[in-house]
């Protein structure tokens, strides 16, 4: 069986959707099936490869809008050549990650035209933060239109949490169920066995630690968390991640680990 995962964001970009897709794909391979991940092009990475986990990856040309946070499909000869290679492989099932990327809209509609069964997994609990002005209004309108186009394919929607499922009601969608993020107990145990003493390594003494792990982008709230922690005596914020807010947080956080 060949399962194709469409994820506009994917490793080595750090984030929840990226690891979620990777875990699904590698478990697909481990179960004896074939996994294909279709994602966005990144500098210095091949447009097509099979990685060490046996996952076949296609990286489509995009415009890296919003510093890469919102990659937009870039039509052209390379795009059409790569997508032709994907569709010729007789996919048995498609999984579309998130509802609002241009790749998500394209993938859902293309799979529908080819009669390939699919589902959509949404990870969000709100609109992409773009402010309350004209830009924000345009962004919200785009999300509504994009979601309507994906919904029109008839694909079932799932949320990664109850909150994500509730958010789908904003677009007139009742989630078919929840597909939560999962932890691999064996991998976690192995990593924990060799974990360094971060309190000693970062020279934090006996201060209380607030830990943030995730992409350093406004919608994840790391900046707001840093402001709140700064008002608490004897408390330090340790952030692990990377993204556009990295320098902003580095100026505030006592210790910053990427």
Across the structure, where does each feature detected by a protein language model lie?
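N-terminal subdomain of nucleotide-sugar transferases
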Residues: 1-45, 49-59, 116, 230
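A short helix/loop element that forms part of the nucleotide-sugar donor recognition site in Leloir-type
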Residues: 189-204, 209
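A conserved mid-protein helix/loop that constitutes part of the nucleotide-sugar donor-binding site
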Residues: 19, 208-231, 244-247
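Nucleotide-sugar donor phosphate/pyrophosphate-binding loop at the beta->alpha transition
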Residues: 117-119, 126-149, 153, 158-159, ...
């Amino acid at each position: 069986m060949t399962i194709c995962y469409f994820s506009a964001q994917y490793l080595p970009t750090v984030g929840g959707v990226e690891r979620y897709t990777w875990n699904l794909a590698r478990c697909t391979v481990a179960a004896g099936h074939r996994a294909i991940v279709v994602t966005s092009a990144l500098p210095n990475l091949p447009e097509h490869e099979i990685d060490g986990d046996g996952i076949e990856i296609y990286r489509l040309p995009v415009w890296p809008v919003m510093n890469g946070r919102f990659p937009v499909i870039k039509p052209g000869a390379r795009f059409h050549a790569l997508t032709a290679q994907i569709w010729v492989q007789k996919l048995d099932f498609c999984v579309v990650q998130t509802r609002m990327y241009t790749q998500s809209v394209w993938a859902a509609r293309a799979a529908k035209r080819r009669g390939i069964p699919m589902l959509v997994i949404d990870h969000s609990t709100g609109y992409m933060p773009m402010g309350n002005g004209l830009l924000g209004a345009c962004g919200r309108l785009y999300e509504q239109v994009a979601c309507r186009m994906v919904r029109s394919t008839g694909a079932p929607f799932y949320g990664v949490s109850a909150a994500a499922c509730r958010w789908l009601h904003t677009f007139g969608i009742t989630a078919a169920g929840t597909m939560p993020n999962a932890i691999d107990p064996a991998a976690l145990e192995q990593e924990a066995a060799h974990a360094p003493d971060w309190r000693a390594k970062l020279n934090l003494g006996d201060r209380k630690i607030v830990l943030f792990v995730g992409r350093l982008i406004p919608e994840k709230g790391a900046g707001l968390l840093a402001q709140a922690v700064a008002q608490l005596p004897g408390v330090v914020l340790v952030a692990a991640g990377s993204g556009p807010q990295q320098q902003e947080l580095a100026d505030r956080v006592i210790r910053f680990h990427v």
